[in-house]
Amino acid sequence: MSSDKLPESKRVLVADDDPVMRHLISTIIKQQKYDVVVAEDGRAAFRILQSDSAFKAAILDMTMPFLEGLDLIRYMRTEKRLMRIPIMMITAEQDIKLMASSFAAGATAFLPKPFTPAQLQSAIRMLLGNRQLRKIAA
């Protein structure tokens, strides 16, 4: 089955300009039996989201070329077809104000870099589980 025909519940968007980080995050998500669509920068993620809204979750880097993660979150939260997708913001910045800005923009979760694979696995499980809780509450 090709990745563009996968059911909504099995796909996660990963947007990060660091190829090593994209690979690490993608590998961990795939280990949890999800499929991954990657974007190498904010503009690429924006284009993907314009044409495809069938994602279980999105994991976005805060600082990316062409379009910052916060701007991408704001876009997602204004689009009806995207607003319910849980979003995890990741960043190497250790500023509490950035975390607050992420949540204010609409992020569901925040994970500071560096993180261990176990921390990422746990954060992804919580992010994806949060989606199920929202469906029950809706």
Listing of model-derived features with the role each one plays in the protein:
Residues 22, 65-66, 83, 95:
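The feature encodes the CheY-like receiver
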Residues 23-31:
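Charged docking surfaces used in two-component/phosphorelay signaling
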Residues 38, 66-67, 104:
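Residue-level signal for the "D+5" position in two-component response regulator receiver
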Residues 38-57:
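Acidic, metal-coordinating helix/loop segments flanking the phosphotransfer/catalytic sites
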Residues 108:
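Short, glycine/charged-rich "phosphate-handling" switch motifs in NTP-dependent
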Residues 115-124:
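C-terminal output helix
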